[in-house]
Every structure is written in structure tokens, then in C-alpha cells.
């Protein structure tokens, strides 16, 4: 009998990677503008459920999450709080990680965009794209939504407001670097048409094709000079890298990508990602900007981007200004972590928004867990005692 010893790939951080089929799943990294509510927390719970299921099927799962920590909004929030941006994001990132741990999520990597290795690679990626001719210097003049960290033309606004969040936008005029989006548009359209599973659900794919790709892409502003809290452009340090170029690259920097060609074995095994699980409000960044950046870097695209719906309060999307926010730790204190996980996974369809409230949680948990499951367990125990 010949016994073969299985070899392992040792990934970044010393994590052994087995010969089992890999499954790389990510959430969007949470923006560190404040404490996440249950609507934000839903995504990490869903990703965790998928990761656990894939592990049970025999996959070697790598599950990455983390925090997005740069941008104008962060700089303004820190100024309001009277502390430095780094102190502000340290506090918020710690709180986000605490809640992810409270929800018993089994992530393998928690990346921060202020991590030294991430910042180093973002600088190298920007320079690589510039040297390739995909990034050029110009002047930006248009509208900017600070909460979304997004640029818009006048024609893209809805009633003069941000088409994504509905908030007011501000005029912006500054020197900036731009990425040649149109250079890769036809290639991306072809990829979407030949890979129907790439953008899911189908409604999200249709939205991206009809509203953005088919009408034609404009070049994207990928640097800012009107604020300082960001990763500086190495060869032009008065510019900081646009927050979405910074944030999106976490999916490759977190597993060992190196723009100079010295990527880790872990990266070579894990990439492309099997699933990017994100909210429907950021689908454009992940299915247009991100794949085009990857094409420019000569990297394969993720296998699937799934834009999940929102978890709403009874009167609409959760908002601190509306006073309708529910926090995960408050719900866990009252119901327990497993009950909260059960509710958000049960109540969220994949096509439409779900609704959460204290009343709905009590009703669902009493109906399903206390009554149905409780009755089943009681009958099973009674029969076991009686007949065995």
C-alpha cells in the first residue's frame, strides 16, 4: 500500500492552502464613516453562510472582508470629530470588526485599505496603469457626490441629485488623472454577453448594460487634489488615488498580488475570485470599473458578481437622519446571535428588498423557532424517551 503525503501551498500569513478545489469569496469592504447597521451587517452574514456551505462541500474556502478607509467623506467626518483621519478610521474599523466577530462570521482575512502592503500595491498599480498609457492627466469639471464618492455629469443626475443615493451633489473642478474606460468597453460588453453568470441577478446585468455600457463610457477621474486623506500618487504626490480604485483593488492585494510580477502562490491559486458579494447600490463599481481595471492589469475577471438587495426598515432604507436604524449588537443582545442570523437569512430574497423590525423578528422567531422547531424537538425527545 503506497501512502502519498499531500502537499500544501503556504499562503500569505502562513495559512496552508490544500489541494482541495478552491473557493474565494469576498464581501464589499465596509466604509468607515460610522457604525454599521443591520442592513450593512446582512452582507457579512450571507457571505459567511455561503462560505460555511462551501467548506461543508469540501472546498478550500478563503473568505475575505475588511474596511474601506480613505476619501473625502472620512476626512470631513474626522474634522467634525476633532481627530485625525487615521484615528477616526482606526476607531470605526475596530468597531466594524467587533460586530463581524459578534455575528460569528468565519472570515479568513480582514483587510484595511490603510494597511501598509495594500497602500504600497495601490501606488504600484496606479503607476503601472499610467506607464501603460491607460491613465493620463487632465482637468475634471462636473458634479461630485461626497457620500457615494462618485463623479457625475449633469445628464446623469436625477432631479439635480445623485442618481445612486438621492442626496445633493456639489460642483467639482480640479486637476486630475483619468482612466481610459472606453478603451476596454467593447471587451467588457463581449465578456458580459458570453458569460451570463458574471453579473447576477439578471436585472442588475440589464441595468448595467442599458444604463451605462451601451450608451458609451466616459473616461473616469481616478485622482483628487481637493483633499488629502488618501493614498498619494507616487510620481505626483499632490494627487491622491480615487477611493474606488483604491478600494476595489483590495480583492487582489489582500491575497498577495504584486504589480511588479512577484505575486504570492496564494494569489496564483485563489484568483480569480469565485464570488464578489456586494450591495446593489455599488454594482456599477464592481461590474464596470473593477473588471476594466483588471483587464488593464492583464488579470482574469471574477467569476461572478452578485448584487444583493437591501434590508430595509418598515419605512424604507435605513438612515441615521430618518432615525430608523437598527444595529446588530442591539438585536443580538435581545435575541441572540443565531436568532439574528436566522432572521436575516430567512427574510432576504435575492431579487427584492427585505424588511426588518423588532415586531417582525419576534413574529418570525416565535413562529419558526419557538413553535415549529421547538415542537419538532419536543416531539422527537418525547418519542425517543417513550420508544427507545
Model-flagged regions — what are they?
Residues 18-65, 117-121, 171-386:
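Structured secondary-structure scaffolds
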Residues 59-60, 83, 105, 134:
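Short glycine/serine/threonine/alanine-rich loop segments
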Residues 77-90:
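A charged helix-plus-loop insertion that forms the helical arch/lid used to bind
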Residues 88-144:
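A broadly conserved sequence feature marking short terminus-proximal activation segments
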Residues 132-185:
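Cys/His-rich short segments
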Amino acid at each position: 500500500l503506497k501512502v502519498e503525503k499531500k502537499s500544501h501551498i503556504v499562503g500569505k500569513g502562513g495559512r496552508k492552502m490544500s489541494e482541495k478545489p478552491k473557493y474565494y469569496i469576498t464581501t464589499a469592504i465596509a466604509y468607515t464613516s460610522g457604525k454599521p447597521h443591520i442592513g450593512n451587517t446582512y452582507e457579512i452574514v450571507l457571505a459567511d453562510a455561503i462560505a460555511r456551505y462551501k467548506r461543508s462541500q469540501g472546498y478550500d474556502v478563503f473568505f475575505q472582508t475588511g474596511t474601506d478607509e480613505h476619501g473625502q467623506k472620512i476626512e470631513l467626518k474626522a474634522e467634525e470629530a476633532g481627530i485625525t483621519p487615521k484615528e477616526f478610521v482606526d476607531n470605526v474599523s475596530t468597531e466594524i470588526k467587533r460586530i463581524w466577530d459578534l455575528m460569528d462570521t468565519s472570515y479568513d482575512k480582514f483587510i484595511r485599505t490603510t494597511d501598509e502592503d495594500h497602500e504600497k500595491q495601490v501606488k504600484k498599480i496606479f503607476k503601472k496603469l499610467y506607464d501603460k498609457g491607460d491613465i493620463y492627466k487632465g482637468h475634471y469639471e462636473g458634479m461630485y457626490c461626497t457620500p457615494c464618492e462618485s463623479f457625475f455629469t449633469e445628464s446623469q443626475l436625477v432631479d439635480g441629485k445623485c442618481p445612486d443615493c438621492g442626496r445633493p451633489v456639489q460642483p467639482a473642478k480640479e486637476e486630475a488623472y483619468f482612466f481610459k474606460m472606453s478603451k476596454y468597453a467593447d471587451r467588457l460588453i463581449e465578456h458580459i454577453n458570453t458569460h451570463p453568470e458574471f453579473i447576477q441577478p439578471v436585472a442588475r446585468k440589464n441595468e448595467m448594460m442599458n444604463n451605462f455600457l451601451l450608451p458609451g463610457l466616459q473616461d473616469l477621474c481616478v485622482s483628487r487634489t481637493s483633499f488629502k486623506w488618501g493614498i498619494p500618487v507616487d510620481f505626483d504626490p499632490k494627487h491622491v488615488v480615487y477611493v474606488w480604485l483604491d478600494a476595489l483593488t483590495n480583492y487582489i492585494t489582500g491575497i498577495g498580488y504584486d504589480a511588479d510580477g512577484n505575486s504570492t502562490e496564494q494569489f496564483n491559486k485563489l484568483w480569480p475570485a469565485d464570488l464578489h458579494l456586494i450591495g446593489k447600490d455599488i454594482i456599477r463599481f464592481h461590474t464596470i470599473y473593477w473588471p476594466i481595471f483588471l483587464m488593464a492589469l492583464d488579470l482574469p475577471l471574477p467569476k461572478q458578481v452578485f448584487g444583493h438587495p437591501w434590508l430595509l426598515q418598515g419605512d424604507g432604507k435605513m438612515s441615521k437622519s430618518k432615525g430608523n436604524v437598527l444595529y446588530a449588537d442591539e438585536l443580538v443582545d435581545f435575541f441572540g446571535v443565531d436568532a439574528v442570523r436566522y432572521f436575516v437569512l430567512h427574510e432576504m430574497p435575492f431579487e427584492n428588498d427585505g424588511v426588518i423590525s423588532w415586531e417582525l423578528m419576534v413574529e418570525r422567531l416565535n413562529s419558526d423557532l419557538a413553535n415549529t422547531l421547538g415542537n419538532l424537538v419536543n416531539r422527537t425527545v418525547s418519542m425517543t424517551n417513550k420508544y427507545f
